[in-house]
A protein has these predicted regions:
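Alpha-helix C-terminal capping segments
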Residues: 4-15
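Hydrophobic beta-strand scaffold residues
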Residues: 16, 42, 128-129, 159
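Conserved phosphate/ATP/ADP-binding segment of small-molecule kinases
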Residues: 138-216
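Charged helix-capping and loop-helix junction motifs
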Residues: 84-85, 111-116, 141-149
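Conserved N-terminal subdomain of the carbohydrate kinase-like
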Residues: 15-101
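Anion (oxyanion) recognition and catalysis
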Residues: 10, 36, 115, 119-123, ...
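A short helix->loop->beta-strand "cap" motif at the edges of active sites that frequently abuts
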Residues: 120-127, 199-203
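Active-site beta-loop-alpha junctions enriched in small/polar residues
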Residues: 73, 102, 133-137, 163, ...
Length: 216
């Protein structure tokens, strides 16, 4: 999610930098080159570790949903220690810090690194944007909530859908499911308001509403 946002911002003409850790080999360099192709600053990326984390995407058809298989065990970023990230250096001159729920789900150490980044952002008046982006194949509801509820106290703008409300924050304030989002706008609004009630530091909550009839 983070790289997609960086690419989108760079494509719109904004300055965007990406922080992660990649193996110092041709595979890691190929990933960096792909980001550079869109104008993303990769100078802050840490180098080292054994391998690049990947996932396999099975495209759905008709009413059969898509399927994702993660292969991230032993990746450079999952094995990185939080102490490797010098946030004073990495966030120098930055106005907005974006992260998704996928990143702290990678490992406990990376969750700690994200929290340290958010503490720095709050102390230095850097706005924090968080896409909750719950992924059930990466962590359980209980683990996600234990981590994300703590991180939410530093978030200025939260992006969430109905599954994120409950799975990540334990907020049950909607009816139905994401496939019928447009028909449930009032329920979504209730969920957003509850986020702001529980996390008054969060200035705005955004979501995408849609009705899904096919995955094609």
């Amino acid at each position: 999610a983070e790289s997609n946002v960086a690419v989108s911002l760079a494509s719109f003409g904004d300055e965007a930098a990406f922080v992660t850790k990649l193996p110092e080999n041709p595979v890691g360099e190929a990933a960096l080159n792909e980001l550079r192709r869109y104008g993303v600053d990769t100078s802050l990326v840490l180098k080292g570790g054994p391998r690049l984390g990947i996932y396999y995407f099975e495209k759905g058809t008709n009413i059969r949903p898509t399927n994702v298989v993660y292969d991230r065990a032993g990746s450079s970023i999952s094995l990185a220690d939080s102490s490797e990230f010098d946030w004073e250096k990495l966030l120098s001159g930055i106005d907005i810090f974006y992260f998704s729920g996928v990143t702290p789900a990678i490992s406990d150490s990376i969750a700690k690194a994200v929290e340290e980044a958010l503490v720095y952002c709050q102390a230095h008046h850097i706005q924090v944007v968080c896409d909750l982006n719950y992924r059930s194949k990466m962590w359980s509801h209980e683990k996600a909530q234990s981590v994300m509820k703590k991180l939410m106290h530093y978030v200025d703008l939260c992006i969430a859908n109905d599954e994120d409300f409950e799975s990540t924050l334990g907020i049950h304030a909607y009816d139905g499911d994401v496939a019928h989002g447009i028909d449930q706008i009032d329920s979504y609004r209730q969920g957003m308001q509850e986020i702001q009630r529980q996390y008054p530091n969060c200035k705005a909550v955004a979501s995408v509403l849609r009705n899904v009839t096919t995955v094609e």
